[in-house]
Amino acid sequence: MSRVKRGVTARARHKKVLNQAKGYYGARSRVYRVAKQAVIKAGQYAYRDRKVKKRTFRSLWIVRINAAARQHDISYSQLINGLNKVGVELDRKALAELAVYNKDAFAAVVEKAKAALA
């Protein structure tokens, strides 16, 4: 068997990690050992935050719906309860879009919910 020198593969691996660490501060973008740790941690944060992003957006939509609903003298929970009773199946993302960009349509939805609660 012939001898395998690993300089080429090591250089390629180091280059790959250092390219992934571009833009990092100080040694994190220059020193392989530090950069490798930084890249691994960045990947962990990215994985975690892809999951958290869904929760964050849902809470943002709820805040927006609640703020718009209270302008029509109804709380968020009452609005959702009323919509469920009527059978309106608008998700929170769609309701938030209506609340921000189409106030007339949102007002109509609120009136339906109020009618169901009365």
From Swiss-Prot:
Q: What protein name applies here? A: Large ribosomal subunit protein bL20
Q: Which InterPro entries match?
A: Ribosomal_bL20, RIBOSOMAL_L20_CS, Ribosomal_protein_bL20_C
Gene3D superfamilies in UniProt: 6.10.160.10, Ribosomal protein L20
Q: Which domain of life is it from?
A: Bacteria
Report the Pfam families cross-referenced here. Answer: Ribosomal_L20 (PF00453)
Note whether DNA repair occurs among the keywords. Answer: no
- Gene name? rplT
Which keywords accompany this UniProt record?
Ribonucleoprotein, Ribosomal protein, RNA-binding, rRNA-binding
UniProt-listed GO biological process terms: ribosomal large subunit assembly; translation
Keyword Mitochondrion part of the UniProt annotation: no
List, alphabetically, the PANTHER family matched: 39S RIBOSOMAL PROTEIN L20 (PTHR10986)
Can you name a GO cellular component term? Answer: ribosome
Q: What does this protein do?
A: Binds directly to 23S ribosomal RNA and is necessary for the in vitro assembly process of the 50S ribosomal subunit. It is not involved in the protein synthesizing functions of that subunit.
Annotated GO molecular function terms are:
rRNA binding; structural constituent of ribosome
